[in-house]
């Protein structure tokens, strides 16, 4: 079971990734974790990565693909894997295909932008305890105050509407074209199978739709 999970920030990919990896006994592979592990291991590739990261550069697709090919030969990938946050661009998707890495399923968690903005921009946090509220779905007893201490709640920089909209526009320009790429590939070659799942409703409902698409 080799899966790519796509979806905008705030679409609920992380939650679904957890259910998929548990259900099928496969690891979740994120490029960030993989790059950090390579640097820590000090392999020749890892040293290359460290050099690029130390100079503030972006790690090239060639290096990332080489790391992925290395990573998926490890024992925990025997039953497959789930890619999280990769590929992000068409060149990465093409490089993955050219490298002979076969993918069985591409799952897009599709959520409307306005729904994502409302989900994220409504979050309020109590910094000291990490308690999270939501102005609509889980409001504090007193607006703007933590239920336990009565201290002020804050809105994190990442949760502000303009930040969320900026991240969504980056997603639409960079990653959304992958949806078309995999839809066309699926139609032409029959693999990977492409599924668009509406990421609205309860977590259980969405999970049921995702797992049924994969089985």
UniProtKB/Swiss-Prot annotation:
Binding site for ATP: 10-15, 123, 132-133, 201
CDD domains: ADK
Principal location: cytoplasm
Record-listed E.C. numbers: 2.7.4.3
UniProt keyword Coiled coil present: no
Alphabetized Gene3D superfamilies for the sequence: P-loop containing nucleotide triphosphate hydrolases
Domain notes: Consists of three domains, a large central CORE domain and two small peripheral domains, NMPbind and LID, which undergo movements during catalysis. The LID domain closes over the site of phosphoryl transfer upon ATP binding. Assembling and dissambling the active center during each catalytic cycle provides an effective means to prevent ATP hydrolysis.
Name of the protein this chain belongs to: Adenylate kinase
Taxonomic source organism: Pseudomonas paraeruginosa (strain DSM 24068 / PA7)
Gene name of this polypeptide: adk
């Amino acid at each position: 079971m080799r899966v790519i999970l796509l979806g905008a920030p705030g679409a609920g990919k992380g939650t679904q990734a957890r259910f998929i990896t548990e259900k099928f006994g496969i690891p979740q592979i994120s490029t960030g974790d993989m790059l950090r592990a390579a640097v820590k291991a000090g392999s020749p590739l890892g040293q290359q990565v460290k050099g690029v990261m130390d100079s503030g550069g972006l790690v090239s697709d060639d290096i990332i693909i080489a790391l992925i090919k290395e990573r998926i030969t490890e024992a925990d990938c025997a039953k497959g894997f789930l890619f999280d946050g990769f590929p992000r661009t068409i060149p990465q998707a093409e490089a993955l295909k050219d490298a002979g890495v076969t993918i069985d399923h591409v799952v897009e968690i599709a959520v409307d932008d306005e729904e994502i903005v409302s989900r994220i921009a409504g979050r309020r946090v109590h910094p000291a305890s990490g308690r999270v509220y939501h102005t609509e779905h889980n409001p504090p007893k007193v607006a703007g105050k933590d239920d336990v201490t009565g201290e002020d709640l804050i809105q994190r920089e990442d949760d502000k509407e303009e930040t969320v909209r900026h991240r969504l526009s980056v997603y639409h320009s960079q990653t959304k074209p992958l949806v078309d790429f995999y839809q066309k590939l699926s139609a032409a070659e029959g693999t990977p199978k492409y599924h668009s799942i509406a990421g609205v409703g309860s977590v259980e409902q969405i999970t049921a739709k995702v797992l049924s698409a994969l089985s």
